[in-house]
Amino acid sequence: MASQRAVQLSLRKPAHAVCVIGVGTLVDVYSDVPKGAKTFEVSGSSEVKIYMVYDPSRVAEPAGPAHWPLDANVDVVVVADTVSKNLHDLKVKVSYFKSQDTAALAHSLLYLTAVDVSLDVDTGRTGKVKKGSGDKKNWRWGSGGSGAILLVNCDRDVHGSREDLHDSHLRSLEDLQDMSPMVLSCDGPDDLFKSHKPVLKASLPDSRRLGVFCARGGTSLSNYKQVLGPRHNSYEVERHPGERDIQFYVEGLAFPDASFSGLLSLSVSLVDTRPLSEVLVFTDSVTFRVAPWIMTPNTQPPLELYVCSVTDMHGSNDKFLEDMSHLATKANCKLVVCPRLENRNDRWIQDEMEFGYIDAPHKSFPVVFDSPRNRGLRDFALKKILGPDFGYVTREIQFAGASGLDSFGNLDVSPPVRVGNTEYPLGRILIGGNFPKSSGRRMARVVRDFLHAQQVQAPVELYSDWLSVGHVDEFLSFVPTSDQKGFRLLLASPSACLQLFQEKKEEGYGEAKQFDGLKHKTKRSINDILADRHLRRDSAHVQKCIDWNREVLKQELGLSESDIVDIPQLFFLKGAYAEAFFPDMVNMVVLGKYLGIPKPFGPIINGRCCLEEKVRSLLEPLGLRCVFIDDFLFYHQLLGEIHCGTNVRRKPFAFRWWNSVP
């Protein structure tokens, strides 16, 4: 039972006070006491409950009709349980006595006006506000937790250039659906609210990260006014006569980040505004958490496949687009082609952006994270993807340009995993960087800070700086499976490739040639490859780099060797950095059970590519379908593959992030 300020009583005149129903008011029975008084008793209106608060070790509770001793260890708290119909219509009477058997020496009177003032939000996470439900001030994770949730209003419901969060005026009623409802109860005698005003307030830092709109009903946009936000952190609520509940809508303006935990608080105070008063009568507070941006792994069903139409010295990539169209059709997935006019001949759409989503009990929608690489596709996400119920977020690097590791081919996420006793029901984010405690390239801190601050997909930093491009998608991928594990981790493996070629040599196919079927590319026999000491040395170095990541992934994702599939792949060093010797097969696009895999142009044995056959034998028993696609001229020769040149929006998790415990 929360208590307000103490109300002092007087023997000379009645005291008057305002109380909030359900909230204790401390009554000071000691400030003005008649001479000779030793005991007291308290009575009141039937709508007022009276509580004696005391320490049993110091004060004995009186028996029967006996009075309470005038002892400073005894407090009187009164609680009204009904809203007043008129001013001062509830009474509390304190009588003072010299002894138990004598008449009262004097009486003090307290007249109360009881009001209902509370701020309520969806603490139960049902999508609806329930009055008086649970602890509103504290936000708790987990399936048994509580606390309201805000979405960052980062979509654009009306055509314009920026996200809705930049608007201080409501531009469409649909925008209210992106906001969290909040109800202010202010029931009581109208005359009281002429002098006592509800004041809504946020701290200055919080006011820069949220917006609050007051709703006065109707379908006109003018009925909705922003009352709190970056320009104002306090609002004296305009209560109309007879009004019991006032509706508000709250929007998030910023995602969690290095300097922002994601928690935001709002309070309402009932303030006595009469001259020479300005007394704070009561305060109620609520706490929101801003919904994090969540990535979706390859195990989630695909919804849309994005790919760019480009032209270069080899002509147009129409054949590749046709292959992507066939793959999308098989996977029952929509194909979205970004035309040259919009991509400015930038084909690396995976590097430009990452699809994710935000989720609250009342609303969810996809959000695209625009990378800071800012090349030909730099305007595509903002101008062509941002729209109604499709949000946008980005992080820009200050005072420096983006490195190759800031592209989002260097950003992935695992399926849900369990590591020891720790559950990661939304998986873990994977990013690439330099070898620990060494100099080298890393993803920009501003991006890493953003990813860590989302909390629900705790990032793991891998070692990718050994690659020329430096992206994690060059040596790993995840594929869905129908068994109990639900997925496999695919790792590129030079050792597996050399072992396969050695087996084929021993079977008598040493003269079968890599790159058979490719024009303008020197063919190399299996014998030649196996005899190439430089290639073997490079392969040994690359294998060590991948093996280091393998151990990190096993530890951080709770994987065993049976959860990993080694995909044969050779690399060579160009200077100090590695590049794929033939199209990098782990750099695939995953559309459900259909895998769009870079065609490796491996040695042809008995009419079939031995590399393709090996990969089929590894993956198709898992229920997957391998579709090998030629990306050699338009992607591989430019140090990228199919995954680099495509992007997939996937179905969000059924699991609700607030039920996790980071």
Curated annotation (Swiss-Prot):
Residues that, per the record, bind Ca(2+) 3: E352, D370, S371, N374
Its EC number(s): 3.5.3.15
The organism's taxonomic lineage, starting at the top: Eukaryota, Metazoa, Chordata, Craniata, Vertebrata
Cell location: Cytoplasm
Upregulating conditions: Induced by all-trans retinoic acid.
Transmembrane domains' residue ranges: none
Source organism: Rattus norvegicus
Root EC class: hydrolase
Alphabetized Pfam families for the sequence: PAD, PAD_M, PAD_N
Binding site for Ca(2+) 1: N153, D155, D157, D164, D175, D178
Name of the protein this chain belongs to: Protein-arginine deiminase type-1
Subunit structure of this chain's protein: Monomer.
Primary role: Catalyzes the deimination of arginine residues of proteins.
UniProtKB keywords: Calcium, Cytoplasm, Hydrolase, Metal-binding
Reactions that this protein is recorded to catalyse: L-arginyl-[protein] + H2O = L-citrullyl-[protein] + NH4(+)
Cofactor(s) demanded: Ca(2+)
GO molecular function: calcium ion binding; protein-arginine deiminase activity
Highest taxon in the source lineage: Eukaryota
InterPro entries cross-referenced by the UniProt entry: Cupredoxin, PAD, PAD_C, PAD_central_sf, PAD_N, PAD_N_sf, Prot_Arg_deaminase_cen_dom
Active site feature: C644 (nucleophile)
Residues that hold Ca(2+) 4 according to the record: Q350, F408, L411
Protein family: Belongs to the protein arginine deiminase family.
Residues that, per the record, bind Ca(2+) 2: D155, D157, D178, K363
Gene Ontology CC: cytoplasm; nucleus
